[in-house]
UniProtKB/Swiss-Prot annotation:
The active site is at K167 (proton acceptor). The lineage of its organism: Bacteria, Pseudomonadati, Pseudomonadota, Betaproteobacteria, Burkholderiales. S-adenosyl-L-methionine binds at G60, W62, D86, D102, D127. This is Ribosomal RNA large subunit methyltransferase E. Keywords: Cytoplasm, Methyltransferase, rRNA processing, S-adenosyl-L-methionine, Transferase. Its EC number is 2.1.1.166. The gene is rlmE. HAMAP family: RNA_methyltr_E.
Amino acid sequence: MAKKKLNKNWLHDHINDPYVKLAQKEGYRARAVYKLKEIDESEKLIKPGQIIVDLGCTPGSWSQYVRNKLSGSVGGGINGIIIGLDMLEMEPIADVHYIQGDFREQNVLEQLEVVLAGRKVDLVLSDMAPNLSGIAVADAARMMDIIELAIDFAQHHMKPSGSLLVKCFNGSGFNDIVEKFRHEFKTVTQKKPKASRDKSSEIFLLGKTLKNPL
């Protein structure tokens, strides 16, 4: 009974969420786009001519936003390269190179390298998150694993001067994640965009300029 009530409350909040309504109005696939938009507007992350990778890109709202930022016009091509990676299937987005699969696997990396053609990435975005169990220690370990995957990807594929933006949760293990970022990046900033729900412990970490590029 409690679970049913919880689901009803979530549905009510979701339907009445101003960011959900705005996403529907502006043609974005998820409200998460406004988290990236706010961070981008304050940090000036996305610029014409960049190569940008969106890790865990499904359903695609972040890639949609990046595409719009690099285009300046609808349907007119883009000034830059966008690559979306995810194990889940995603509906195509114009001008976005989508690669389905686990980016730890060789065949996926080979597809990535074909698109990159020897070039390095300017910006890596990651909205990836684990399925939370409610067990703090286990969830913290899963989150750290995902953060480390994103950092490792950035070290191998990003320009030394590039930036990595990741989602994490401000709870058990968060300080360890921040320390990991400080060890790997010259500048680390914590971001809590307005589009993050008040009840959520979600927070974003932005690392700029790699200390240990590979």
